Amino acid sequence: MDWRININMQDIKYIHYGSNSFDPIKFHPIKNVPFYTKPEGGLWASRTNKDFGWKDWCKKRQYHTEKLEESFQFIVAPEANIIEIHSCEDLKSIPQASLLTAMYIPDFESLASNGVDAIEVFISEDIALYDNLLGWDVDSILIMNPEIIVLS
C-alpha cells in the first residue's frame, strides 16, 4: 500500500464540536455511503491551530452554530496509523469505493479494515480536493478507530 502515513502526531491537538466529552459508546463504526464522499460513523474534528477550521466555517455559513458551544479537545495516540491527503494525487493512492461517479469516493470500510485509524484531509493545500471530495469543506480528520483518541 502506497498511502501517506503520518507517524508523529503527539503535538497536534484536535477539536470536536457538538459535545463536551468523548463517549465511546456513541462512536459508530465506519460505513461507506453509496455515491457520497463521506462515510457514516467515525468522529470528525479539525486541528485547533488552523486559521480557518470547522468553527469558522460554521460561523461564516451560519450552519449549526448552536453546536459550537460544546466541544472537547484530544490528541491521537502515537501509534495511530493516519493517512494524510494533501493533494488529488494523494487521493488517487487510496482505495476507491465506486467507479460510477465523476467524484472520487474513498472506500473507508477498506481503509479501516486494513488498519487505517484515521484519514486527515488538507483541503487548504489543494483546492481541487474540495471538488473531488464534495462535503469536506475544511481541513479535517475523520477518526475511524476510537482507540486512538487521547483526551487532553
Give residue ranges: language-model regions.
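Active-site and NAD+-binding cores of ADP-ribose-processing enzymes
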Residues: N6-N32, K59-S152
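A short, exposed loop/beta-hairpin motif centered on an aromatic-Gly-Thr core
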Residues: K26, I30-R47
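A short, charged, amphipathic alpha-helix used as a generic interaction element across diverse proteins
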Residues: E40, N49-C58
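Residues immediately flanking
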Residues: T48-N49, I123
